[in-house]
A protein has these predicted regions:
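Hydrophobic, small-residue-rich membrane helices and short re-entrant helix-turn-helix hairpins
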Residues: 143-154, 192, 215-244, 262-274, ...
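Hydrophobic alpha-helical segments and their helix-loop junctions in multi-pass secondary transporters
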Residues: 96, 100, 160-187, 205-206, ...
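Selective recognition of specific alpha-helical transmembrane segments in multi-pass small-molecule
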Residues: 54, 58, 158-171, 234-260, ...
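Membrane-water interface regions at transmembrane-helix termini and the short interhelical loops
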Residues: 65-69, 73, 132-155, 221-224, ...
Length: 452
């Protein structure tokens, strides 16, 4: 049994981790954060890096150290019904409800929308674009082959090179000093926590639970079998990819902040990224950005459709087969994509506010499980209390019309009175700790009785 990877193997796993979590769509969030955070950008970046870089790495390590065979297996430590619910909810979120549609709308917003006349026909153009986009995505998802691998190997380096050129030019020719840019919205009063919650939008912590088993299995296939060694190898290999991802996020965020000297804060990061590219590199730069982002998002969409279809065909063996699931998810994604990028980001927020506390709690339990033998009692009490608080966070983040219809103001007032950190969007922390404490007390009481 091998205890550690070679330098070459670390590089291989690191590149896989980077490819797993970094996508062109992720860039729209740091650039938007930069425009909004203004002079408070460094506190906001710190929050973003915790949820956008640190948590995904811990999610993969959690799968390794807990010896789980994937998300369903890990969440089954609570119970099987919860595992079915959580697995379906998470895959639908990083799949046809939000992440896959976002691939199409990001491509449209960064590219075609920037050259269209503002005459109210964008809805029709988005429909036509998304039909073509998902027709291509479904075509490749139903015909897996080496072409997408080849496109990825060629495209990712090209995209990173172009991004590097854009960011370097933007940073070397700032249109405003960071200290002079006024922070907007929540970034003016609580930049760290606003950045922390912005990291939810990357969905990478959710993706780490869904796809992290791929990386863990690769490490195991390379001969590392001990759970602690697998987790250690994952973390060490992930340091390089995490540092690279963090560097890219920081650079793009700063470019977004400095763009406020010539650009107004955009409605979403896709528009901001396109405007920055056009400002610094002209129409040619905008075209190159649009082409690379579109192809990169297409590749991501194909991967997500494939993964979701495979997962649901495995979860429901007596239900539709892979091909039918792929078609269903493509059609659902097409429907949601036509809401537009800003609407998708807005509607995804309540779901992310619900899923992220549950995911963070599950990751923490998996990482620390050796101290309580992965006792189901601890898992149940922790997730149970977290679930209650997560429902509260979901309600608070609902659109205003729905929020008011379900007596949201009264629920919000109650939570802010009795839930510490609720006003920061982190009201789940104390309930999670309380649930964990109860679970641990019951675990050790039962353990002591067994020894007596």
């Amino acid at each position: 049994m091998k205890r550690k990877l070679t330098a070459k193997e670390y590089t291989y796993v690191a590149s896989m981790l980077f490819g797993l979590f970094f996508g062109a769509g992720n860039l729209i969030f740091p650039v938007h954060l930069g425009q909004m955070a203004g002079s408070n950008v460094w506190q906001a970046i710190l929050g973003l890096l915790i949820t956008g870089v640190g948590l995904p790495l811990l999610g993969v390590a959690a799968l390794g150290i807990s010896r789980s065979n994937g998300l369903f297996d890990l969440s089954s430590k609570v119970n099987r019904p919860y595992a079915m619910f959580f697995t379906c909810a998470l895959y639908l979120t990083i799949g046809p409800f939000f992440a896959i549609p976002r691939c199409a709308t990001t491509s449209f917003t960064v590219g075609l929308e920037q050259v269209l006349p503002q005459n109210g026909s964008n809805t029709l153009y988005l429909l036509l674009f998304s039909v073509l986009f998902f027709a291509a995505a479904l075509f490749f998802a139903l015909r897996p082959g080496k072409i997408l691998t080849w496109v990825g190997k060629i495209l990712n380096p090209c995209f990173l090179v172009f991004l590097a050129i854009l960011v370097v030019v933007a940073l070397l020719s700032p249109s405003a000093a960071i200290a002079d840019v006024e922070p907007l919205g929540d970034y003016a009063s609580q930049p760290f926590f606003a950045g922390f919650l912005e990291g939810y939008n990357t969905m990478d912590a959710l993706a780490s639970l869904a796809f992290g088993i791929i990386v863990v299995q690769v490490i195991r296939d390379l001969g590392v079998d001990d759970p602690a060694a697998v987790a250690g190898s994952t973390v060490r290999a992930g340091i390089f990819s995490s540092l690279l991802m963090a560097f890219i996020y920081i650079a793009v965020t700063i470019a977004g902040t400095q763009s406020r000297g010539v650009l107004e804060a955009s409605e979403n990061g896709g528009t901001a990224l396109a405007q920055i590219a056009q400002h610094y590199l002209g129409s040619a730069g905008l075209f190159i950005l649009a082409a690379t982002v579109t192809l990169a998002c297409l590749k991501t969409a194909v991967g997500l459709i494939t993964s979701c279809a495979e997962t649901f065909s495995a979860l429901f063996p007596d239900g539709p087969k892979y091909r039918i699931w792929a078609i269903i998810f493509s059609l659902v994604s097409l429907l949601f994509a036509n809401l537009g990028l800003s609407a998708i980001i807005s509607y995804s927020l309540p779901v992310l506010m619900f899923l992220y506390p549950l995911s963070i709690a599950l990751i923490a339990l998996a990482l620390l499980g050796k101290f309580f033998g992965h006792d189901r009692t601890v898992y149940c009490w922790t997730i149970g209390f977290t679930l209650i608080a997560a429902v509260y966070d979901l309600i608070i983040a609902l659109p205003e019309s729905v929020f008011n219809a379900i007596h949201g103001p009264a629920i919000k007032a109650f939570g802010q009175q009795y839930l510490p950190f609720a006003d920061l969007g982190l009201g789940w922390i104390c309930p999670t700790l309380i649930g964990t404490a109860i679970g641990l007390i019951l675990h050790f009481m039962r353990e002591n009785r067994a020894k007596a």
